[in-house]
Amino acid sequence: MNIKNKLSPAVIKTSLQGTTKEEVIRELLEVLVEAQLVTDRETVYEALMERERKMSTGLQHGVAIPHAKTTAVKSLVACIGLKPEGVDFAALDGLPSRIFIMTLSPIDRVGPHVQFLAEVSMVIRTEEARERLLQSKNAQDVLSVFGL
């Protein structure tokens, strides 16, 4: 999988407004709906929240990767949202999440989701890359961190 096939300015939001996990998830989902990548908003929201109930997708270093499998997408879709002040996402390290990468994949496919997350992880593994993301003023700044 090539990350550049999944990321574009249409799926990047550099100033999330949500202040709770639920609000951030809804806001990111709306980005995908507006980009016409999701066919059923509520089905996807329920799938995302069910995943969060099983185990938080808040990782470490201010990164959260809300994700779900759903019938509402035909192939893997993704979006990126930033909130420099952070939101409590019940992260593994207890710190607020500030970088959000949402992925949705079809129920019957595993590979693309894992490949996409591996590629993203390679980019955001350094503090320098995460700081560059958080300082992004627009979608093109975000894409440049990913080499796009």
Segment roles from a protein language model:
Residues 1-148:
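Cytosolic covalent-transfer regions centered on His/Cys nucleophiles
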